[in-house]
Amino acid sequence: MKSKRNDAFQNKSIKVPFVVPNIDSSDKKAIAIALKSNLLTDGPILRKFEKEFSRFTGSKYAIGVSNATSALQLSLKSLGIGKGDEVIIPDITFVATANAVLFTGATPVLADVNEDDLNISINSIDKNITKKTKAIIPVHFAGKSCNMKSIQKFAKDNDLKIIEDCAHALGTKFDKKHVGTFGETGCFSFYPTKNLTTFEGGMIITQSKKMAENLRSLRNHGITKSLRQRFTKGHPWDFDIKQMGYNFRIDEIRSSLGLNQLKKIKKMNKLRQSACKYYNKNLKNIDGISVYEDPKLESNSCHLYVIKILSNFGITRNNLFSNFVKNGIRTSVHYKPLHKFSLYKNKCKIYFPLKTSKSLYPQILSLPLFPQITKNEMNSVIDVLKKQQK
């Protein structure tokens, strides 16, 4: 029998971790190659990573950044969104979505989510549009695409910008088109739990040359030239700054890792899809458990596997979480709704009741999911749920 995996949070083994980063020998080799370079940031490996990422997503331009939060923030700033403006975001999302809006001086407006996939509700978007609304940030939750056709129509009819939060969705498509290409920008995360990791990192994609040039400047203090341009043409100190920028760069080492991971992403996503199918098959007939089945799973990056604990299951979500811990299995919740955080109670606006997010929050639970997960590990998870019925 295979030995238990190490727990990332405690110095001991665990039966089933929540996630295991997919780092193999080829990734380590890619990192080693980057370390031999004399240029460890803003160099040729980043350019190649951006080029290949652009090709993979079908976008014209890709801009590597330090993380997805900075990707969102730069996108908002590049679109001129700031103080006095409102940006519609889903109530169930990671806090970074709200923080990026707040950093610009704009106000996040919390919209409700769909019962069937936890993506932002189209009806809720419609209700929350005001004279101050400047943009919508749809979050492709767990890897399932939002209804981008409807969101694009709302945006066009109301002269709004779209910034896609694709942190969960590398490989996700809507109508055969990669997410992130429907809005002004698409923002991706390379955090260790994501489908592609650079430890920390992110990427912005856009179809606009003007926006791409502006984003490259903004990520590097507002400087108008790249390092290569500065040191190969004229004097390296002779550059201009026309706007306030940030230090949101991504280095060559992480770019090399990301470039290598990108070569494997289709295979890794297929493994995730297979794991989701196995969970669905074994969980959908358990009384009190509701699974989120996606009929277009091949277009879903399957970043998370979320179940809903119904009232007839016998115990609460929190008690089930504790049962998993007792059995050496880590689970989590994605996410605590934004309206429940102290900061956002004061900083965000809620124009209409968030009925669905409020009702779903005590019910949802994310089960272990990663490309390397085995059937034995998934069976351990399934057994805990089945035993609760006895």
Q: How would you label these PLM feature ranges?
A:
Residues 1-39, 44, 240-242:
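N-terminal "arm"/small-domain region of PLP-dependent enzymes with the aminotransferase-like
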Residues 5-8, 46-51, 59-63, 123, ...:
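PLP-dependent aminotransferase class I/II
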Residues 77-166, 173:
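PLP-dependent aminotransferase-like
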Residues 181-225:
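Active-site PLP attachment segment
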